[in-house]
């Protein structure tokens, strides 16, 4: 069984489905755990990130990040640059969308955000533009809606994805290149393989990190949550609800998680840096005593405070007398005698 844990960015051609690419990568690499991040329709090309091995657990994290596309909009009438740019401004920000009829999700009204909409080129009725958007935005629907606002109608003619989260077009490799890399790897030449294979922690370059102590790793491996006692440090000032990457003190990625509180609320992460321990319990002539940590004073006991007795009964003889009166075994009168004796002393006060 293969032990590949990372990502490969495939330049998906038009024609095959995203699931067919999964199958081909599975055959090429020998890794049974393969999944893609963000489905591309058969007629769409571009960045298709393949997760292998343990990286399949990180698919949802990458899928939530923004995506970038280059598309061609075909309108049914001619427009000038100013008209197109004016409509693009209306579609920048949060918009309403209903997924197209041919989609893998239910056709319900939803809100998606367009971060940037840039006009690149125009030729007759064809408009080339670039869009950076929230995950789950349908570019086909966006083109149709832009056509309605223009007045003549329009539809998507071409679409290519150029970025998914931190993976951009410059990191793409064809299926043939991926196949060649693994064939050369099996022959001992890993140069091309190292060029196309991306480790898991690449996606966390801009994420806040939580560095845990070695003593916490066993519990984390069993799925336990992380508590302040197991944290060595936090970088990036994450807020409640933020996704964080969990690293060891040796900079090894071991888990991901969600912050339950703000980083500045973990007040007991490291409050006091201890220089000297002053409360060690030692042994001095058979009696427990507090001993100073400093070796120069190692054998010098610290005087314990005098034990205070109940009420005003400070003298040992007085305590014994009172105890005898209250203890039938010592010739006293029981609890009643002790109570009455205590009330008498209380009255004298």
From Swiss-Prot:
One of its GO terms (biological process) is rRNA pseudouridine synthesis. Keywords: Isomerase, tRNA processing. SMART domains: PUA. Coiled coil: none annotated. PROSITE patterns: PUA. Its EC number is 5.4.99.25. Residues 300-349 are annotated as: Disordered. Residues 300-309 have a biased composition (Basic and acidic residues). It catalyses: uridine(55) in tRNA = pseudouridine(55) in tRNA. Belongs to the pseudouridine synthase TruB family. Type 2 subfamily. PANTHER family: CENTROMERE/MICROTUBULE BINDING PROTEIN CBF5 (PTHR23127), H_ACA RIBONUCLEOPROTEIN COMPLEX SUBUNIT DKC1 (PTHR23127:SF0). Could be responsible for synthesis of pseudouridine from uracil-55 in the psi GC loop of transfer RNAs. This is Probable tRNA pseudouridine synthase B. The gene is truB.
């Amino acid at each position: 069984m293969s032990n590949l844990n990372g990502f490969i960015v495939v330049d998906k051609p038009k024609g095959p489905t995203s699931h067919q690419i999964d199958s081909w990568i599975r055959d090429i690499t020998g890794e049974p755990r393969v999944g893609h991040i963000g489905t591309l329709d058969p007629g769409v090309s571009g960045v298709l990130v393949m997760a292998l091995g343990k990286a399949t657990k990180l698919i949802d994290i990458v899928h939530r990040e923004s995506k970038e596309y280059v598309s061609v909009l075909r309108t049914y009438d001619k427009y000038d640059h100013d008209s197109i740019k004016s409509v693009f401004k209306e579609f920048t920000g949060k918009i309403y969308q209903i997924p197209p009829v041919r989609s893998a999700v239910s056709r319900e009204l939803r809100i998606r955000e367009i971060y940037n909409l840039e006009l690149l080129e125009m030729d007759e009725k064809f408009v080339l533009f670039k869009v950076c958007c929230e995950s789950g935005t349908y570019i086909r629907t966006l083109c149709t809606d832009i056509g309605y606002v223009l007045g003549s109608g329009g539809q998507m003619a071409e679409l290519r994805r150029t970025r998914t989260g931190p993976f951009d077009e410059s990191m793409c490799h064809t299926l043939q290149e991926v196949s060649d890399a693994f064939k050369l790897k099996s022959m001992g030449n890993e140069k091309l393989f190292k060029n196309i294979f991306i480790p898991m922690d690449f996606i966390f370059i801009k994420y806040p990190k939580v560095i845990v102590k070695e003593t916490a790793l066993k519990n984390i491996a069993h799925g336990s949550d992380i508590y302040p006692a197991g944290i060595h440090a936090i970088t990036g000032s994450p807020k409640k609800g933020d996704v964080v990457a969990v690293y060891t003190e040796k900079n090894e990625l071991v888990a991901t998680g969600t912050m339950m509180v703000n980083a500045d609320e973990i007040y007991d992460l490291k409050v006091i840096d201890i220089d000297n321990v002053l409360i060690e319990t030692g042994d001095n002539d058979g009696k427990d005593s507090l001993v100073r940590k400093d070796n120069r004073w190692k054998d010098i006991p610290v005087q314990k405070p005098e034990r205070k007795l109940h009420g005003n009964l400070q003298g040992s003889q007085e305590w014994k007398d009172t105890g005898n009166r209250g203890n039938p075994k010592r010739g006293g009168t029981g609890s009643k005698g002790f109570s009455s004796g205590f009330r008498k002393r209380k009255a004298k006060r």
